[in-house]
Amino acid sequence: MDTWHDALGGEKQQPYFQEILNAVRQERLSGQIIYPPAADVFNAFRLTAFDRVKAVILGQDPYHGAGQAHGLAFSVRQGIRIPPSLLNIYKELETDIEGFSIPAHGCLTAWAEQGVLLLNTVLTVRAGQAHSHALLGWERFTDTVIRQLATHRKHLVFMLWGGYAQQKGRLIDSQNHLILTAPHPSPLSAYRGFFGCRHFSQANSYLSRHGIDPINWKL
């Protein structure tokens, strides 16, 4: 199993998946603003090939502000103000990774291109309404993504931040992969243990131990 098509082709033919796409399409046609734009919904898969995934960072649903979401969890387009959770991720990187300095942008495409799958468990959202598409069925699809990676790949790093993401740990065999957990980087919880978690250096140590090139986290 080498490609996302191999891993997910059957899933995308399932009636529930077609129903999700139709529901989102109908909302867009009715004039509802949906993020990210239609062309960006599956960017995480476009930028990070199945056989090149090294690490998975799980988000919840996309940013719901104008111009923010572009299909990668926690990431925003160049020129968009860095959101608070991402700024806290940068602050942790600054203390964890030697030579990392906080960039002036929040675009994480460079990570995705190196094999960091930035996966939101829900892939769309209505403008200004967090979790508005939480019940559409996206999680059934993204649970399959996690399960397929955990089953058909070896020595991946899964970063699960916050209770919601940590529920997905049940889909992953910790004998074959590294599961790193911490509180969410949100300003509400970052000081309860996200700061100081050192997940990024731990990820690189694990990858190196298994003969896999580490990730250059610098942006």
Swiss-Prot record:
EC numbers for this chain: 3.2.2.27
One of the GO BP terms on file: base-excision repair, AP site formation via deaminated base removal
Keywords: Cytoplasm, DNA damage, DNA repair, Hydrolase
A GO molecular-function descriptor: uracil DNA N-glycosylase activity
Subcellular location: Cytoplasm
Claim: DNA damage is one of the keywords in the record: yes
InterPro entries: UDG_fam1 (IPR002043), Ura-DNA_Glyclase_AS (IPR018085), Uracil-DNA_glycosylase-like (IPR005122), Uracil-DNA_glycosylase-like_sf (IPR036895)
Pfam families, sorted: UDG (PF03167)
Origin superkingdom: Bacteria
A GO-annotated cellular component: cytoplasm
Active site: 61
Membrane as UniProt keyword: no
The reaction(s) this protein catalyses: Hydrolyzes single-stranded DNA or mismatched double-stranded DNA and polynucleotides, releasing free uracil
Family according to the record: Belongs to the uracil-DNA glycosylase (UDG) superfamily. UNG family.
Role noted for this protein: Excises uracil residues from the DNA which can arise as a result of misincorporation of dUMP residues by DNA polymerase or due to deamination of cytosine.
Record protein name field: Uracil-DNA glycosylase
Organism: Neisseria meningitidis serogroup B (strain ATCC BAA-335 / MC58)
